[in-house]
Amino acid sequence: MAEKFDHLEEHLEKFVENIRQLGIIVSDFQPSSQAGLNQKLNFIVTGLQDIDKCRQQLHDITVPLEVFEYIDQGRNPQLYTKECLERALAKNEQVKGKIDTMKKFKSLLIQELSKVFPEDMAKYRSIRGEDHPPS
C-alpha cells in the first residue's frame, strides 16, 4: 500500500515542480521561450494523466473533508489526527466514568436488596453462580 502512496507522491512532486517552472517561464515571457512554454504545458498535461492513473489505484482511500479544511487554513493535517485522538481519549474517559459509576450502583443496589430481600437475593446469586454476597 505504501508503494502506491510513494508513486503518487513522486508524480505530485514532479507536477508541482513543473508548475513552478511554468510560473517562472510565464512571469518573464519572451517570444523565444515559446518552445519551452509549450514543452512545460505538455509536461503538465502528462503529469495530470499520471496523477489520474494513480487515483484509480487509490479509489478505496477516503480522506475526511476536515483534513482539507486544515490544509486550506494553512494548518498541519497531522493536527487533525492529533485532535481526533484527543477527542476519542476524552470520550473514552467519559464512558469509562459512566461504566465505573454503573458498577458502583450495581454493587450498592445488590447490597441494599440483599438486606431487604435476603432469600430472593440468595436465589439470584445462585442463578448467577455467585457464592458469597458482595461486601
Swiss-Prot record:
Listed InterPro entries: Mediator_Med10 (IPR019145)
Cellular compartment(s): Nucleus
Biological processes, Gene Ontology terms: positive regulation of transcription elongation by RNA polymerase II; positive regulation of transcription initiation by RNA polymerase II; protein ubiquitination; RNA polymerase II preinitiation complex assembly; somatic stem cell population maintenance
Record's keyword terms, sorted: Activator, Nucleus, Transcription, Transcription regulation
Keyword Transmembrane helix: no
Gene Ontology terms, MF aspect: transcription coregulator activity; ubiquitin protein ligase activity
S-S bridge residues: none
Main subcellular localisation: nucleus
Listed Pfam families: Med10 (PF09748)
A GO CC term assigned to this protein in UniProt: mediator complex
Role played: Component of the Mediator complex, a coactivator involved in the regulated transcription of nearly all RNA polymerase II-dependent genes. Mediator functions as a bridge to convey information from gene-specific regulatory proteins to the basal RNA polymerase II transcription machinery. Mediator is recruited to promoters by direct interactions with regulatory proteins and serves as a scaffold for the assembly of a functional preinitiation complex with RNA polymerase II and the general transcription factors.
Similarity remark: Belongs to the Mediator complex subunit 10 family.
Quaternary context: Component of the Mediator complex, which is composed of MED1, MED4, MED6, MED7, MED8, MED9, MED10, MED11, MED12, MED13, MED13L, MED14, MED15, MED16, MED17, MED18, MED19, MED20, MED21, MED22, MED23, MED24, MED25, MED26, MED27, MED29, MED30, MED31, CCNC, CDK8 and CDC2L6/CDK11. The MED12, MED13, CCNC and CDK8 subunits form a distinct module termed the CDK8 module. Mediator containing the CDK8 module is less active than Mediator lacking this module in supporting transcriptional activation.
UniProt protein name: Mediator of RNA polymerase II transcription subunit 10
Species for this entry: Homo sapiens (Human)
Lineage: Eukaryota, Metazoa, Chordata, Craniata, Vertebrata
Gene designation per UniProt: MED10
